[in-house]
Amino acid sequence: MCKAEKFLYHRKLWEMKVKFLGDSKIDKLKNSLVLRSRMSLWMIRAMTILLLWSCFVHLVAVGEMWGPRLLKGWPSCFNHHDFPIAAEMTSLPMKIALPPKRIYQNNGYLMVSCNGGLNQMRAAICDMVTIARYMNVTLIVPELDKTSFWNDPSEFKDIFDVDHFISSLRDEVRILKELPPRLKRRVRLGLYHTMPPISWSNMSYYQDQILPLVKKYKVVHLNKTDTRLANNELPVEIQKLRCRANFNGLRFTPKIEELGRRVVKILREKGPFLVLHLRYEMDMLAFSGCSHGCNRYEEEELTRMRYAYPWWKEKVIDSELKRKEGLCPLTPEETALTLSALGIDRNVQIYIAAGEIYGGKRRLKALTDVFPNVVRKETLLDSSDLSFCKNHSSQMAALDYLISLESDIFVPTYYGNMAKVVEGHRRFLGFKKTIELNRKLLVKLIDEYYEGLLSWEVFSTTVKAFHATRMGGPKRRLVIPNKPKEEDYFYANPYECLQLLHENNGNSLEET
C-alpha cells in the first residue's frame, strides 16, 4: 500500500472513530441533560473539541512513523489522481521533533573533500557520517568536488539542505558547518594531517590507523572519499547508519525539491512515465573509449578528449572488445531496440535523465522514431525555471535524481554511480521497478538480430526471460571476497536496511 493510500485509510479510520466516539459522547451528554438540567451546552462543545484535538495529535504521531517521504507531502507511489491528496498533505504544517543530541567525548575533527559526480559524492558523504560516528569525532560539513570534469562550483548548501543534514543526524554524530576559530588557525598554519584513506576499508582500519591521527593532530582532512568503506563484513548498525544518512539525512534544497515536484506533476498529468538514464554523454564515451555507432570524426574527437585529461588513466582502448564485454553504455539505437523487446508501450512518456546526448538529435532519432513521447527537463520547463542551476551539473543531476525516484520504471543504460544509488533508493521506497540491463547479453543478441540469426519473436522472448529477475526486487548482494569492485555495491542494494519491506511484501531474500 502506497503512502497516499495509507493516508486515505488512516484518515477514514480516524473520521469513523471520531464519529463513533463523538456520537457516543453526545448521546450520553443529552441523557445527562435530561437527568441533570444543570449541564450546559458549552460543556458539550468543549468536550467535542478536546476529543477532536486528541485524535488529531494521535494521527500526526502515527503519520511520523510511516517512514521517509521523497519530497515534502508526496506519497511514495503515484496515480495521476493522487495530486489533490498530495496538495492537502503539503498544506498541513507538521512540526517534527528533533532527535536528542548524542553526548560523547569528542576525539577531534574530521574534514572531508568529496570527489566525483553527485551520486559518487552522495554515497561518500554517507560513509563519512558513519566513519565519524564510529570514531567519536566531529564531522565538518563535507566539501564538494569543484575541479573534476564537471567543473561545478556548487557548495554543499547549494544542493543539500544543510540544516536538516546536521539536525537529523545529531543523535548519532556532531556535525558543524565549519571548524571552531582556534582550529581554523591551526589549519592555516598547516598544523593538521591530510591524506586519502585506503579504498574499501573496514572499520578496524579507521579505528587503528585514522583515529590515532585525529587524536594527535586534532584535525584530519580526508582528500579522497569515493568507495572508502567496504560493501560487506560490517556490523549491521554501521550499515543501517549509512542508510539513515542516505535516505533521511540527505535531503535536497527546497528549491530543487519544489522544481522536482513540478516536473513530476507535469508528467503525471499525462499518465505513467519511464525515466531513462541514457548515459550517452561525451565525457562518458571519451572516458570509457566506447565509440560504437560513432563516425570517424566523432571517434577522433572522443580520443582527443580522453588524452586531454591526465587523470583518466586508460588511453588506448579497444571499443568493440569493451562493448562485447558489456562495459559500454547502450547506444540510443540499442536502447530503442531493448525497450521494444522488453514490451515497453511505445506511447509511454520517456523522461531522459542525462546531460546533452552525444550526436544530438541525429543519434536520438532512432529512439524518438520508436518512442515519440521523449521529454527532458529542458522541454518541460521554461529556461527561467532552470536558470538557478544552469552550468551547475550537480544541481541538474539532483533534479534528475528526484524524478528518477518517482518514475513508474527506471532504466539505466549504464551501471554507473547514479544508476546504482537510484536503484538502492527505489528499493528502499518499496522495491519500485528498476530494470538492470544485462549489456553483455544484449549486445550479443542485438548483433545476432541485425545479422538475421534471430527472429524478432525469439529476440524479444529471450530479452524478457533474461531480465525477469533483474527488476529491482528483494535479493542479497553478491559478495566476492577481496574483489570489492566486482561484487554488488552496497548502495545499490542495502538489504540490511530493507528487512521490514521484505516481510511486509511476503518476500524472502533470494541468494544470488
Swiss-Prot record:
UniProt: substrate binding residues: H277, L278, R279
Membrane topology: Single-pass type II membrane protein
Main localization category: Golgi
InterPro entries membership: FucosylTrfase_pln, GDP-Fuc_O-FucTrfase
Reactions listed under catalytic activity: alpha-D-galacturonosyl-[(1->2)-alpha-L-rhamnosyl-(1->4)-alpha-D-galacturonosyl](n) + UDP-beta-L-rhamnose = [(1->2)-alpha-L-rhamnosyl-(1->4)-alpha-D-galacturonosyl](n+1) + UDP + H(+)
Residue positions with a glycan: N136, N202, N223, N391
Pathway in which this enzyme or protein is active: Glycan metabolism; pectin biosynthesis
One MF term in the entry's GO annotations: glycosyltransferase activity
Keywords: Carbohydrate metabolism, Cell wall biogenesis/degradation, Fucose metabolism, Glycoprotein, Glycosyltransferase, Golgi apparatus, Membrane, Signal-anchor, Transferase, Transmembrane, Transmembrane helix
UniProt cross-references to CDD domains, sorted A to Z: O-FucT_plant
Top-level division of the source organism's lineage: Eukaryota
Pfam families: O-FucT
GO cellular component, one term: Golgi membrane
Membrane spanning residue stretches: 41-63
UniProt-listed PANTHER family: OS02G0726500 PROTEIN-RELATED (PTHR31741), RHAMNOGALACTURONAN I RHAMNOSYLTRANSFERASE 1 (PTHR31741:SF58)
Family statement: Belongs to the glycosyltransferase GT106 family.
Function: Glycosyltransferase involved in the formation of rhamnogalacturonan I (RG-I) oligosaccharides in the seed coat mucilage, which is a specialized cell wall with abundant RG-I. Transfers the rhamnose residue from UDP-beta-L-rhamnose to RG-I oligosaccharides.
Name of the protein this chain belongs to: Rhamnogalacturonan I rhamnosyltransferase 1
Record organism: Arabidopsis thaliana
Lineage: Eukaryota, Viridiplantae, Streptophyta, Embryophyta, Tracheophyta
Recorded name of the encoding gene: RRT2
